[in-house]
Amino acid sequence: MQMLNSQTILNSEEETKNFAKAFAATLKPNNIVLLNGDLGVGKTFFCREIIKYFCGENTSIISPTFNLLQTYKTPHFTIYHCDLYRLKSPEEIYELGLEEALSGNLTLIEWSEIIKHLLPTPLIEVNLKLLDDDKRLCNITNEY
């Protein structure tokens, strides 16, 4: 399934789950995925489905909103899930150990705008937009 540089309308929560898992199947270590969109649009939900794809459906997934970073081990790499909503300056990211996350691991970053210019390329960007209560527009691009 071609996902990079694509635009898809997701009509339900179930469709979003399935799409996120299909997207996860295209990911590998060293990928950096930036998730953007308004508050409550489903960035964390999308990340949860990616993490479940690699770690199993029963994995306990905690939103990183308050501590900024959560890690999840897979047999071959670690998934770093960051939520930078509360970040005040780009320099704060170094205190989290994000540099380690970027080498050989899968990194998912919500609210990435504040540090995007500091990240190595290529980057995969997932932009979510609310169309109505259940519908989302998902635009995925690969930036070099």
Swiss-Prot record:
Principal cellular location given in the protein's record: cytoplasm
Pfam family, one: TsaE
InterPro entries: P-loop_NTPase, T6A_TsaE
Keyword NAD carried by entry: no
Keyword Magnesium in annotation: yes
Gene Ontology MF terms: ATP binding; metal ion binding
Keywords, sorted A to Z: ATP-binding, Cytoplasm, Magnesium, Metal-binding, Nucleotide-binding, tRNA processing
Biological process, per Gene Ontology: tRNA threonylcarbamoyladenosine modification
Matching Gene3D superfamilies: P-loop containing nucleotide triphosphate hydrolases (3.40.50.300)
Compartment list: Cytoplasm
Residues holding Mg(2+): T44, E110
Gene Ontology cellular component terms for the protein in this record: cytoplasm
Positions with a binding annotation for ATP: E13, G40, V41, G42, K43, T44, F45, D133
Stated role: Required for the formation of a threonylcarbamoyl group on adenosine at position 37 (t(6)A37) in tRNAs that read codons beginning with adenine. Is involved in the transfer of the threonylcarbamoyl moiety of threonylcarbamoyl-AMP (TC-AMP) to the N6 group of A37, together with TsaD and TsaB. TsaE seems to play an indirect role in the t(6)A biosynthesis pathway, possibly in regulating the core enzymatic function of TsaD.
Cited NCBIfam families: T6A_YjeE
Family: Belongs to the TsaE family.
Record-linked PANTHER family: TRNA THREONYLCARBAMOYLADENOSINE BIOSYNTHESIS PROTEIN TSAE
Descriptive protein name: tRNA threonylcarbamoyladenosine biosynthesis protein TsaE
